[in-house]
């Protein structure tokens, strides 16, 4: 009898649970259909009640038993308007919500941040306004609300989120002090807000870039806070015996203040007059010195139409003007005198010097790189230049055409490439926004760059290295074919050269620590270049109000916890179809390249082979080997 009752109860419970599960997934479906009807979207969603939600709906992930919807991912889907709060109350099993890079506006519904199982919220690059809801789920791991219009204080409840590892609130209008934040936090960015007060001790270990753009913040790692000084209480200088005495005291105080002001003005005027006289004296002395030393600077001639050209010839001495050394195979027919007469335009300033576009009188256009802080002597410099200049030709390597060396001036001459460089193509420049670069073009550019670097590594008995791999040094022809430039310069430079933060973003940890470059550190830099291509984020500090980005660390923090696809450039997601596997494969190659341990990184030859396997010659999207699971990426030893 007991067995029959137990069997009956088991059947009853099983039926009840199955019905509950069915109701749950059905209610999730209805909630999502409600979401689609309430939130306008320019990209069509294939959400239809007639097709299975877990298998076919765009941006939807379900639990393993298909019982509940656990992830909603609609980045760059053209969503606009406010989010419906009641809809998310019904989706209480969500662990991940990614609505980044849309046009959503209004307040962030408080129910979303307090969902019981929510772990990752990616709401950056929208138009959300209002304050950050104070009630937050204790399970939150990743919270990105950056690049919105949020205001008010940062909630103090954040300090109670013991699992939070990544917090991005930059580029908003948040104000007030920074609260204490949880100790497990590994990535923090609060830059470009209106925060004030002292940086709390719980986050002082983060770099200054995490707090930049908040002019009222102080304390480590920013400038020290001023000491708190309290003004002494005013006390009367004479006893107050009645109204008459008080009036005399006030009158005396005014008289003393007026005298002090007069003395201050007199002293200030004297100091100002002294400074003006000193400046006039220095200017006169410089003018006299310039007249005596005018022979050291090449005299401008009528054909020289731009004063910028003098910058890369200012250290050239008259006796050495014809010592421009050309390499075999160069078709140029000019000497240093012709080069110094050329009009010039600054193309950019990098780690090792300034680059100019020089147009000679006969119309020839070349690129001249003026090196700074060269530590090598003449013999060592010439030997290195000979090794660089005599490397066997390769279609993806920009050849060094000529060089010049003197005590005060070191110049390198290259071909001019009309297509610009990969950085300009990927991120745009000051004159305009970036183009929507498709996956095919990105993949081909990076593969050609890899072939060029691999050739540099294999030439001259594998003794050469690049030493300065970054997207601005990946030059492009008009047909967008790649030539890798600026290789072989690193061994000549001073170890004390100040490397800009935008270049540090490409440097391997061991290269930053020792200031010595190897072929393995080149592989790391190329891995960062691949991550830059995949994410659309510039490595290191960029112009404008962009934050300092440690790409390997950022990518690893995302794929460690959640969905690998969250790292990809929204432009790729908008444009491309059937290339997700190739993108994941490329991400795996990039993460192998940026391994913390140099010996764990592949060689550039191996990198080329792996990239060629993704897209064999003549095959289309999706035809490469099937991508491995995201867990493989998360388990790599790349920096966290």
From Swiss-Prot:
Alphabetical UniProt keywords: ATP-binding, Leucine-rich repeat, Membrane, Nucleotide-binding, Phosphoprotein, Repeat, Signal, Transmembrane, Transmembrane helix
InterPro entries, sorted: At_inactive_RLKs, Kinase-like_dom_sf, Leu-rich_rpt, LRR_dom_sf, LRR_N_plant-typ, Prot_kinase_dom, Protein_kinase_ATP_BS, Ser-Thr/Tyr_kinase_cat_dom
Localization per record: Membrane
Region of interest (Disordered), residue spans: 222-249, 289-315, 612-640
Protein kinase domain boundaries: 341-614
Sites bearing Phosphothreonine, chain numbering: 364, 441, 514, 564
Residues reported to bind ATP: 347-355, 369
GO molecular function: ATP binding; protein kinase activity
Membrane topology field: Single-pass membrane protein
Modified residues (Phosphoserine): 343
Disulfide bonds: none
Domain note: The protein kinase domain is predicted to be catalytically inactive.
Stated family: Belongs to the protein kinase superfamily. Tyr protein kinase family.
UniProt xrefs under PANTHER family: OS05G0588300 PROTEIN, PROTEIN KINASE DOMAIN-CONTAINING PROTEIN
Descriptive protein name: Probable inactive receptor kinase At3g08680
UniProt organism field: Arabidopsis thaliana (Mouse-ear cress)
